[in-house]
Every structure is written in structure tokens, then in C-alpha cells.
């Protein structure tokens, strides 16, 4: 079955045709490890996880590379300001290495909590200085870079086209440029490949241009080429990286080897908070740990993200998370009920399940259309007959969803003994046909934060999520 991705490079949905069908090569821009990753950052990682899983669902083997930026990313996202790592180290009274190790660990803890697969190769910028220097030297040799008193810059005037991914108007930017940070730059859009370090700069390395450190963009180009070659299949990242970072990666690659590094460029949209921007000043910067502290399994956020296509803005609300928590519980309950189900399936039932699987497959292959795919997941979960074959289909879907659908709901394991005792008392009241007592106990259980639901398989106790 064909796969289609919306390609930022071509501005349309393209049929996926791998360079080498035996191995799909992917590069993802990872975190700058100077602070906690937000749930907005994690939304990008969730979409990248779905991409990996979808390719594997289609039978492909994957080589996925993700970088860890631990030097060179300045606060402006350009060539101005302080290195984010150094700023964080100063504010937290730690060394840059301590900052990097701390936030790298937290990042991977969050990936694990969300059941996001770790890429096959994770590479740190500070461990690839040699490759970056060689890359810059080659750009100098090819005539695409020049030296000033402060840095080595990429000369965008040498390119046949810039920008390629975004709709930036370079001529308008030139006309509107009022202040140039470095008057030695030939063009306002020229960007730093390598930055000469002040004497007191903590993170610096020897280079042909003296003690210095890499620019943000050269890191991904050098590491991507090292592990994936001059050209690979897919490059991913957040939509914010299109004009600030990915344009310059393409420029560097064209300058060094004459090629655009990836054939397909996929970008995830922003996360909104209650319809607005996530902002520290508004007090609405949420982390994965905040979801945990509200009493939710972090995977609930992953399921919540599937309510919206990765190329559309997703609006985060705690009400939405509460609804997703209930949905996760229902899906896991359906899996368990089907696993132990004894209903017989007819030939017509089997054909219908096969059609559901085909529809799911078409949905994920259509630019990772998870909202549509989830409609078929629910069709299977609500299948009238309970049979292990339905559980098997749900488990197959979960190889893409990654929501641990076969896991017994943790809420059941955490129900206090007091509630269990009340549930048992209510059960006895019902057996004695004491409906008044039964209703009173139900209301008491509800007041204590739980709902009881009578099903043909017994009593289901559901925690009421509260903000």
C-alpha cells in the first residue's frame, strides 16, 4: 500500500519513494538540553514516533538519527545573544556539562513515560566537533563561506535559491534591515557556521580560526551526513524550525555536496494552551511531570494528541486530557474483554474486521492521519462480539499508537481499600435487592472520587479525574 506525506519542500502531498527500500533513513532535530522539554516539544516527538511506527507497520526497516544540541544554540535562534547552555548554567549555578546531562536525562525520561521509541542513533553535538570543523573547512574550500573578525559565515548569495522551505522574502528583509549585528557580514541572512569565542567563554575548541565553537545549524548537517550520508529519506522537526534552522541546513548541504539533504521534510504544528500561546508569563508552560502530578498516565497525552492531525494546531485543555484518560481506559478495557471473549465470529465478522484493518492502514498511510485512524480503532473496540481476534487487531493497531493497549488499567490497581469495601457493600445490597442502600452507596463512592458501572462482566470502578 502506497504511503503519502505532506512534503514542506514541494508544498504538496507526495508519494513516498525511499532511496533504499531496505532501510529508511530519518533525521530528527532533537532538543537543546538547557531546560525541561514542554508538552509542546513532546507533541513533535509523538508525531515522529507515529512516523517511525507507521513505516515499520508497512514493513520497512528504519535507521533514525536524532541529535542532542548541547552547544551553539543561541538565545535568538540566530547569531545573536548568549548560548542557551551557558545562560542556563549561569542561572542554575552549574557547569554546562551538568546542565546537559541533567536535562538530557529528563528528556529521555519523558520519552519513556510517553512510550516514544528512542531513535537508533542519538548523537551529541559536543562529541562531533571534528566532523563539524571538517564540514566548515569544506564549505570554505568550495567558496560558500568566509571569515570575519567574529565568525565564519555562510554566504547565501552563492546559492541558486534561498530560501527553499519557507516563504521568507530575502529582498524585503534586506530593505528592512536597520541594524546588522556584525557589519562584516556580506548579507543580512548570512549565518554563522563557526563562532570565535571570547577569552572567558566556557565552551570552546581549537580550530583553524582560533578558540571557537560551532553554530547551531552546522551541528545537524555534520551529524546527519556522518550517520546517514549526503542524502537521506526524511527530515523531521517542529514547524518553528523551518525558517530558523532547516533552511540553513539545506544551504549548508548544497554548499558542501550540491544536494538537498532529505527528500521529504515533515513538520509538526504548534500546541496551543486553552486556545492561546504557551507562555511562561501566563503560567501555562506544562511538562510531562505536570500531567503525572494531575493523576494522569502520561500516555493519556499521547492519545489526546491523536485527536488532531500533526499538521494542525492542537488545543490543550485539562478537560481534553480528562476525556482522553477515559478513552484510554475504555480502549484497555475493550482489549481485556476481547482477550477473554468467547463469542464466535462468523465469516462476515472476519471480513468486517479485515476491512477495519485496511481502513486503518489507509489512514496512517495518508500523511499519518491519526484522527481518521482512531475512528477505525474505536470501530474495532466497539465491535459487538468479544473475541481474541478483536484483541489481536487492537494490539496490531497499538504497534502504531504506542498507548500500551494491553496494559491493565493502573487506576484499578490504585483503588483504595475503602472504596473496594464500599463497592462490596453495594454489591451485597444489590444481591439483597436493597436498591435504596445500593443507591446511597453509589452516591458515597461518587463523592469519594469514583464511579461504579455495572456491566455483564461485573462491576467496573472508574476514577473520576479532577483538575
Protein language model annotation of sequence segments:
Residues 1-34, 49, 109, 130-337:
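Alpha-helical recognition segments enriched in aromatics with Gly/Pro capping
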Residues 10, 19-113, 454-457, 461:
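N-terminal, positively charged nucleic-acid-binding surface of large information/translation enzymes
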Residues 56, 140, 446:
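Anion (oxyanion) recognition and catalysis
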Residues 59, 94-98, 108-134, 144, ...:
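Non-catalytic interaction-recognition regions
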Residues 61-63, 143-149, 384, 451-453:
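Short, well-structured beta-strand/strand-turn elements
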Residues 65-71, 100-107, 117-132, 150-159:
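Short, glycine/charge-rich beta-strand/loop segments that flank catalytic centers
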Residues 277-280, 284-467:
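Structural preference for alpha-helix termini/caps and helix-kink/transition segments
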Amino acid at each position: 500500500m502506497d504511503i503519502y506525506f505532506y512534503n514542506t519542500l514541494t508544498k504538496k502531498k507526495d508519494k513516498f519513494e525511499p532511496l533504499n527500500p531496505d532501510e529508511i533513513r530519518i533525521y530528527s532535530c532533537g532538543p537543546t538540553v538547557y531546560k525541561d522539554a514542554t508538552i509542546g516539544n513532546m507533541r513533535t516527538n509523538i508525531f515522529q514516533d507515529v512516523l517511525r511506527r507507521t513505516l515499520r507497520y508497512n514493513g520497512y526497516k528504519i535507521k533514525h538519527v536524532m541529535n542532542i544540541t548541547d552547544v551553539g544554540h543561541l538565545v535568538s535562534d540566530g547569531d545573536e545573544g548568549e548560548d542557551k547552555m551557558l545562560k542556563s548554567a549561569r542561572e542554575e549555578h552549574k557547569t554546562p556539562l551538568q546542565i546537559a546531562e541533567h536535562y538530557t536525562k529528563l528528556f529521555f525520561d519523558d520519552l519513556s513515560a510517553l512510550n516514544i521509541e528512542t531513535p537508533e542513533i542519538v548523537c551529541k553535538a559536543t562529541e562531533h566537533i571534528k566532523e563539524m570543523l571538517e564540514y566548515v573547512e569544506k564549505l570554505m574550500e568550495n567558496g560558500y563561506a568566509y571569515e570575519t573578525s567574529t565568525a565564519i559565515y555562510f554566504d547565501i548569495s552563492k546559492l541558486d535559491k534561498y530560501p527553499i522551505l519557507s516563504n521568507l522574502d530575502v529582498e524585503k528583509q534586506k530593505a528592512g534591515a536597520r541594524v546588522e549585528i556584525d557589519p562584516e557580514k556580506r548579507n543580512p541572512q548570512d549565518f554563522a557556521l563557526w563562532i570565535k569565542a571570547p577569552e572567558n567563554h566556557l565552551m570552546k575548541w581549537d580550530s583553524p580560526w582560533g578558540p571557537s565553537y560551532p553554530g547551531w545549524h552546522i551541528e545537524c548537517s555534520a551529524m546527519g551526513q556522518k550517520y546517514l550520508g549526503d542524502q537521506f529519506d526524511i527530515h523531521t522537526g517542529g514547524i518553528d524550525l523551518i525558517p530558523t534552522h532547516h533552511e540553513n541546513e539545506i544551504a549548508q548541504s548544497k554548499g558542501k555536496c550540491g544536494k538537498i539533504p532529505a527528500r521529504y521534510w515533515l513538520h509538526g504544528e504548534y500546541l496551543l494552551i486553552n486556545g492561546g500561546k504557551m507562555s511562561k508569563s501566563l503560567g501555562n508552560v506544562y511538562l510531562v511531570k505536570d500531567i503525572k502530578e494531575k493523576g494522569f498516565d502520561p500516555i493519556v497525552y499521547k492519545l489526546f494528541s491523536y485527536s488532531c492531525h500533526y499538521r494542525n494546531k492542537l488545543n490543550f485543555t485539562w478537560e481534553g486530557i480528562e476525556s482522553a484518560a477515559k478513552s484510554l481506559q475504555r480502549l484497555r478495557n475493550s482489549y481485556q474483554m476481547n482477550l477473554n471473549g468467547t463469542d464466535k465470529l462468523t465469516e462476515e465478522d472476519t471480513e468486517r474486521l479485515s476491512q477495519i484493518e485496511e481502513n486503518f492502514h489507509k489512514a496512517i498511510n495518508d500523511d499519518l492521519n491519526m484522527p481518521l485512524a482512531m475512528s477505525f480503532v474505536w470501530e474495532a473496540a466497539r465491535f459487538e462480539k468479544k473475541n481474541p481476534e478483536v484483541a489481536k487487531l487492537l494490539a496490531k493497531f497499538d504497534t502504531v499508537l504506542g498507548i500500551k493497549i494491553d496494559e491493565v488499567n493502573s487506576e484499578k490497581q490504585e483503588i483504595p481499600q475503602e472504596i473496594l469495601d464500599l463497592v462490596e457493600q453495594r454489591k451485597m445490597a444489590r444481591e439483597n435487592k436493597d436498591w435504596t442502600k445500593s443507591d446511597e452507596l453509589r452516591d458515597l463512592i461518587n463523592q469519594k472520587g469514583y464511579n461504579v458501572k455495572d456491566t455483564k462482566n461485573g462491576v467496573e470502578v472508574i476514577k473520576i479525574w479532577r483538575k
